[in-house]
């Protein structure tokens, strides 16, 4: 249901109709675009690697030796003109990216343009230092990070407009030291981006704001198109994987509130595999997300960033990831991206851009 507004009923009806049309347009682009498998390079080779690999994929209880990295998780070294260009622009504007801070294995493909030649980067707002210390994440932590850069919303919008993208992902560190968790800062950034290009799709991968629903509403009502918040792991493992201030049920509450406050948003979450979860627990997490109104889901392999972080319990096979993709579709997710190297913002821009181009060709 729409929230009650101080406006005539006729305006409410027109607003609801406009938002519904916008949502349907986004869904149409998603459904008519390529599926996730279209973006995987050398998929045939990956299948051969899986079928011929005889290495150990799971650590048994009590074992301390690290698992050997299977061939389907090996990626190329970041390089190329596009990669260098984006890195230079980000440094000049003093912007951070989760691609670098979280040591994403896809940085070379996304920044370099990959097979399809499209540059994709995920901007990380509010600095590079988080107030939380999740045991899977390599982003720096501190109780009192540096103050927010008041110029960041404008600088971010300038950078994005110069790249000419159709889709951009904004994420952020947690800022529990701020009264509003930085929600107003994120919302201002979205508005600056939309002011320069009203046609761009903006996805925000945001914190839980410690369950503060006013902060959730600030983001949900700022003009973004996709509200993302990651559940990360199954309920049983949450206390051991995420920071103590992050809670499984709180994540579901945040995602549900965003959807209830603005029903025309697409909501999205992400799940890491390989931390010791069972198939039944993964299934239940997917069901919980659907019940909370989540429409998009990504599943990827957890990879230990440093020796200080949680060890990998299991390297999940591409075949199993394919199973979860199919299960997500059966459960009614708008789309499910599931693969060993999938991350919450992996190839998001390229997905939408390719989809848009495909639709334009059909209409010619």
Curated annotation (Swiss-Prot):
Binds 2 [4Fe-4S] clusters per subunit. One cluster is coordinated with 3 cysteines and an exchangeable S-adenosyl-L-methionine. InterPro entries: Aldolase_TIM, Elp3/MiaA/NifB-like_rSAM, LIAS_N, Lipoyl_synth, rSAM. One of its GO terms (cellular component) is mitochondrion. Gene3D superfamilies: Aldolase class I. One of its GO terms (molecular function) is metal ion binding. Keywords: 4Fe-4S, Iron, Iron-sulfur, Metal-binding, Mitochondrion, S-adenosyl-L-methionine, Transferase. Transmembrane segments: none annotated. [4Fe-4S] cluster 1 binds at residues 99, 104, 110, 345. Signal peptide: none annotated. Residues 115-334 form the Radical SAM core domain. Pathway: Protein modification; protein lipoylation via endogenous pathway; protein N(6)-(lipoyl)lysine from octanoyl-[acyl-carrier-protein]: step 2/2. Residues 34-53 are annotated as: Disordered. The keyword Lipoprotein does not apply. Its cofactor is [4Fe-4S] cluster. This protein may be expected to contain an N-terminal transit peptide but none has been predicted. This is Lipoyl synthase, mitochondrial.
């Amino acid at each position: 249901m729409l929230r009650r507004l101080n406006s005539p009923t006729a305006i409410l009806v027109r607003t609801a109709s406009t938002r519904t049309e916008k949502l349907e347009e986004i869904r149409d682009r998603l459904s008519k675009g390529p599926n996730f498998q279209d973006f995987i390079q050398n998929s045939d080779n990956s299948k051969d690697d899986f079928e011929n690999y005889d290495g150990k994929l799971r650590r048994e209880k009590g074992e301390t030796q690290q698992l050997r990295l299977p061939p389907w998780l090996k990626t190329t070294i970041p390089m190329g003109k596009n990669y260098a260009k984006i890195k230079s622009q980000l440094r000049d504007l003093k912007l951070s990216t989760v691609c670098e801070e979280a040591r994403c294995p896809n940085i070379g493909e996304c920044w370099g343009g990959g097979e399809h030649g499209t540059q994709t980067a995920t901007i990380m707002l509010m600095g590079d230092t988080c107030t939380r210390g999740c045991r899977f994440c390599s982003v720096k932590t501190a109780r009192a990070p540096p103050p927010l850069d008041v110029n960041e919303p404008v600088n971010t919008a300038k950078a994005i407009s110069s790249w000419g993208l159709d889709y951009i992902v904004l994420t952020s560190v947690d800022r529990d030291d701020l009264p509003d968790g930085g929600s107003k800062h994120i919302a201002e950034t979205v508005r600056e981006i939309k002011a320069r290009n009203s046609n761009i799709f903006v996805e925000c991968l945001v914190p839980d704001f410690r369950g503060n629903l006013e902060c959730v509403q600030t983001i949900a009502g700022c003009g973004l198109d996709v509200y993302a918040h990651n559940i990360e792991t199954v309920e049983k493992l949450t206390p051991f994987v995420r920071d103590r201030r992050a809670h499984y049920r709180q994540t579901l509450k945040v995602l549900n509130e965003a959807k209830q406050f603005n029903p025309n948003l697409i909501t999205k979450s992400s799940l890491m595999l390989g931390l010791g979860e069972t198939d039944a627990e993964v299934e239940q997490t997917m069901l919980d997300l659907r019940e909370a109104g989540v429409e998009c889901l990504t599943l990827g392999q957890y990879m230990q960033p440093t020796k200080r972080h949680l060890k990998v319990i299991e390297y999940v096979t591409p075949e199993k990831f394919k199973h979860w993709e199919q299960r997500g579709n059966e459960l009614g997710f708008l789309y499910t991206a599931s693969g060993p190297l999938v991350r919450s913002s992996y190839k998001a821009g390229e997905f939408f851009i390719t989809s848009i181009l495909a639709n334009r060709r059909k209409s010619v």
